Swiss-Prot record:
This is N-acetylneuraminic acid outer membrane channel protein NanC. Outer membrane channel protein allowing the entry of N-acetylneuraminic acid (Neu5Ac, the most abundant sialic acid on host cell surfaces) into the bacteria. NanC proteins form high-conductance channels which are open at low membrane potentials and which have a weak anion selectivity. InterPro entries: Bact_OM_Channel_sf (IPR053713), Oligogalacturonate-sp_porin (IPR009331). Residues 33-39, 62-76, 103-107, 133-151, 174-190, 213-228 are extracellular. It is found in: Cell outer membrane. The gene is nanC. Pfam families: KdgM. It catalyses: N-acetylneuraminate(in) = N-acetylneuraminate(out). Induction: Induced by N-acetylneuraminate and modulated by N-acetylglucosamine. This regulation occurs via the NanR and NagC regulators. NanC expression is also activated by the regulators cyclic AMP-catabolite activator protein, OmpR, and CpxR.
Length: 238
């Protein structure tokens, strides 16, 4: 309930205050995970400023995942992200930032730094390192109460095909710091996301996304299942 109130407050500010949000973006996305047989809905509001600051807030809702099978719909998590762009020259940019994730288990902090390179006016490459630190403890494989902290590396490729279409690829490697395992029975896991955007109007951009999430699917007491994510969404400039 508190997370819902926080999200409502931020959305109200974004929609009602022109001084705070003059060109915000609202992103609505739905998806399905084939291994876990789970449906998701995401609502995200983001804003960038000319002075280099960027911020977003989003909520994620699942129907059956993360031991939440008794409810048809529930607000599983809310996260807030802030970063600042430092232009090194006309092609290179460094973005230090922080992601704060709220869930029923507790709060997770993810400080990161991202380096991006505009190879051409249509082609961009990026790489990011993020450290996910949990402010709460959970039982590890040895039975001890520890923090399930994670090292995360991301790679990005974005290509503007033409005035109508943009293609993006994000590859991710996760590595658990302590005595925990992913659903693939390993301390590490990978993800690959492929997105195709259609710039229907200057203010409306629908898109489709396919993700391969390694063998991280969990369903009916079984894990190590091949996990595919199929998503469709649309972004609106407000």
């Amino acid at each position: 309930m508190k997370k819902a109130k926080i999200l409502s407050g931020v959305l109200l500010l974004c929609f009602s205050s022109p001084l705070i949000s003059q060109a915000a973006t609202l992103d609505v996305r739905g998806g399905y995970r084939s291994g876990s047989h789970a449906y998701e809905t995401r609502l995200k509001v983001s804003e960038g400023w000319q002075n280099g600051w960027w911020a977003s807030m989003e909520s994620n809702t699942w129907n059956t995942i993360h031991d939440n099978k008794k409810e048809n719909a529930a607000l599983n998590d809310v996260q807030v992200e802030v970063n600042y762009a430092i232009k090194l020259d006309d092609q290179w940019t460094v973005r230090p930032g922080m992601l704060t994730h709220f869930s029923s288990n507790g709060t997770r902090y993810g400080p990161y730094v991202k380096l991006s390179w505009d190879a051409t006016k249509d082609l961009n490459f990026g790489i990011r390192y993020r450290y996910d630190w949990k402010a709460y403890r959970q039982q590890d494989l040895s039975g001890d109460m520890s923090r399930d902290n994670v090292h995360r590396w991301d790679g990005y490729v974005t290509y503007h095909i033409n005035s109508d279409f943009t293609f993006a690829w994000q590859t991710t490697l996760y590595s658990k710091q302590n005595d925990y395992r992913y659903a693939n029975h390993k301390k590490w896991a990978t993800e690959n996301a492929f997105v195709l955007q259609y710039h229907m109007t200057p203010d409306i951009t629908p898109y489709i996304e396919y993700d391969y999430l390694d063998r991280q699917g969990v369903y009916n007491g079984r894990d190590n299942l091949s996990e595919n994510s199929y998503r469709i969404g649309v972004s609106f400039k407000l």
